[in-house]
């Protein structure tokens, strides 16, 4: 378990076995011609989610999750002929590969996010920094905690990785690079000042001689 800055505990992500053979989420659409001027369309949303013992999701939660999934995966839908239908029935499944790709990317991002958070935590405690800079790093650390918590929740519950979450990760990554770049510049400036002082000392020694 990981404890966030707000004192909350977040469960680590434990992916389901890869050989389970059951997609976490999919959409099935069946389209069948009925008579000359009628078409029957059936739409099914199928989801497998982890739940705590003795609990179950509400109807509203199921509808909201389905709506979010349709928004995220609308571009992946594609009709395919069903062999047994003799061309009178078509069905489609959402492409699971793209979802798995995004999930793997998110899994790879988590260790990087935790490293970034650790850097901000170190800077927050660094007494050589100004109060403003320490507070700034503390705020960035809190932001990392929120993103890590959201990412872990998405992975643990099999939710699709939203574009909003991807943007958050990209933004915190950009911010961390800027902060680290500024730290490097500060280190270089300090080093230059020491070198300048040393060269002045050598010059004054030569003049006095």
Curated annotation (Swiss-Prot):
Residues 1-20 are annotated as: Disordered. Residues 1-11 have a biased composition (Basic and acidic residues). This is Uncharacterized protein B0252.5. It comes from Caenorhabditis elegans.
């Amino acid at each position: 378990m990981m404890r966030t800055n707000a004192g909350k505990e977040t469960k680590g992500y434990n992916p389901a076995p890869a050989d389970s053979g059951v997609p976490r989420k999919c959409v099935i659409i069946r389209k069948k011609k009925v008579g000359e001027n009628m078409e029957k369309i059936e739409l099914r949303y199928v989801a497998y989610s982890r739940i705590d013992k003795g609990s179950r999701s509400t109807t509203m939660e199921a509808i909201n999750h389905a709506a979010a999934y349709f928004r995220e995966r609308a571009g992946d839908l594609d009709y395919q002929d069903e062999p047994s239908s003799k061309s009178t029935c078509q069905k489609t499944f959402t492409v699971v590969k793209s979802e798995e790709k995004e999930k793997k990317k998110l899994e790879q991002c988590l260790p990087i996010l935790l490293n970034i958070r650790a850097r901000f935590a170190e800077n927050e405690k660094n007494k050589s920094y100004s109060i403003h800079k320490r507070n700034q790093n503390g705020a960035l650390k809190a932001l990392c905690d929120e993103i890590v918590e959201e990412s872990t929740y998405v992975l643990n519950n099999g939710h699709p990785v939203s574009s909003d979450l991807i943007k958050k990760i990209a933004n915190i990554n950009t911010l961390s690079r800027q902060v680290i770049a500024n730290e490097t510049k500060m280190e270089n400036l300090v080093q230059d000042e020491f070198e300048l002082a040393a060269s002045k000392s050598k010059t004054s020694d030569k003049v006095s001689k």
